[in-house]
């Protein structure tokens, strides 16, 4: 190998490090993902109080010490689960409406994305997203509320743009829409409905009574 070839090889490897090779997650990222996935499942089956860190470690096929290496407490692990789902849902809705311009089409698209996202991630959402914020540990409560508020800002903007008849309270409309769609987590039957059909039917019924 010539000195020039060796130098080129070093530069190539250096460039990869500088730009970041995102072809595969690191071992640490894989381990955290396994822990979060195990926690999602156990928080849903056993509840937050019922699932111990030892249980989560066993489900992730890891030692308890390894779980604590990545998450200093069960509360921080709960936040990781909530943040993962919350950000996925936020980005799903934001991306879905990005190229839409008609106010009602944007609203319908957001409702479909919201419902689809909740039902795609159903096992954890039943235990997490329906839980009132005051039920969360105090150490993470403010973060949960902040992320929830950031998500709801999307719907605040969408509803502000809708042509509604006089007297319709837009805050109540937002709470009604998000609440009704989210409750589908408990009664959804895939052999009977689709997430899109649920969202469209509910919004259509509301629209009939509120549109200007």
Feature locations, PLM:
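N-terminal intrinsically disordered/low-complexity leader segments
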Residues: 1-30, 37
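Hydrophobic alpha-helical segments that form the core
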Residues: 4-8, 168-186, 197-209
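Generic hydrophobic, amphipathic alpha-helix propensity
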Residues: 31-39, 56, 81-93, 155
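Helix-turn-helix
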Residues: 34, 38, 42-76, 80
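Short helix-capping/turn signature of helix-turn-helix
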Residues: 68-71, 130-136, 179
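Hydrophobic alpha-helical connector segments
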Residues: 80, 94-120, 173-174
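Amphipathic alpha-helical packing segments from all-alpha helical-bundle domains
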Residues: 84-90, 109, 138-163, 170-175, ...
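Amphipathic alpha-helical segments used for helix-helix packing
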Residues: 118-139, 156, 186
């Amino acid at each position: 190998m010539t000195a020039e070839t060796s130098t080129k090889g070093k530069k190539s490897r250096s460039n990869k490090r500088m730009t970041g090779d995102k072809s595969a997650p690191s071992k640490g990222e894989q381990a955290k993902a396994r822990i979060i996935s195990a926690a999602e499942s156990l928080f849903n089956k056993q509840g937050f109080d019922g699932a111990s860190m030892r249980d989560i470690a066993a489900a992730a096929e890891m030692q308890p010490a390894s779980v604590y290496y990545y998450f200093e407490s069960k509360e921080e692990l709960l936040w990781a689960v909530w943040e993962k789902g919350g950000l996925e849902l936020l980005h799903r809705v934001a991306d879905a409406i990005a190229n839409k311009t008609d106010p009602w089409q944007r609203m319908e698209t957001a409702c479909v994305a919201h419902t689809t996202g909740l039902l795609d991630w159903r096992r954890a959402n039943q235990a997490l997203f329906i839980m009132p914020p005051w039920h969360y540990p105090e150490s993470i409560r403010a973060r949960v509320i902040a992320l929830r508020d950031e998500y709801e800002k999307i719907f605040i903007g969408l509803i502000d743009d809708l042509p509604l008849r006089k007297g319709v309270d837009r805050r109540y409309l937002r709470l009604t829409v998000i609440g009704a769609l989210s409750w589908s987590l408990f009664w959804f039957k895939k052999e009977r409905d689709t997430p899109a059909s649920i969202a469209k039917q509910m919004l259509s019924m509301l629209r009939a009574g509120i549109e200007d």
